[in-house]
């Protein structure tokens, strides 16, 4: 993976190239974050190029790692264990308006 193009969604943690987020959106969060065909700013604000660790989630598998990271109901792919950065306050507010609780994936949230 290239550190210059790969980014992690700050809401679900999936890792994709920047251009894929812009062209196709996030496969898990598109209905709430609206990356597809949006200005690059939305992708810049809601994804991070700085992440640690990888977890591979396969099709139709129950992974203990997936459950611990709260990604077991997401599409198959590579996910970041820890993502440096947080969503901007206005995005967190938009999520709250939709009754979606944001849990940062930077290690600051407690269970």
From Swiss-Prot:
SMART domains the record matches = Spt4
Offer one example of a GO biological process linked to this entry: regulation of DNA-templated transcription
Keywords of the record: Centromere, Chromosome, Metal-binding, mRNA processing, Nucleus, Transcription, Zinc, Zinc-finger
Q: Name one Pfam family in it.
A: Spt4
Write down the InterPro entries for this protein, in alphabetical order: RPABC4/Spt4, Spt4, Spt4/RpoE2_Znf, Spt4_sf
- KW Lipid metabolism (keyword) present: no
Q: Where are the zinc fingers (C4-type)?
A: 9-29
The GO cellular component terms are:
chromosome, centromeric region; DSIF complex
Similarity comment: family membership: Belongs to the SPT4 family.
Q: How does it assemble?
A: Component of the SPT4-SPT5 complex. Interacts with RNA polymerase II.
Functional summary from the UniProt entry:
The SPT4-SPT5 complex mediates both activation and inhibition of transcription elongation, and plays a role in pre-mRNA processing. This complex seems to be important for the stability of the RNA polymerase II elongation machinery on the chromatin template but not for the inherent ability of this machinery to translocate down the gene.
Name of the protein described by the UniProt record: Transcription elongation factor SPT4
Q: Which gene encodes it?
A: SPT4
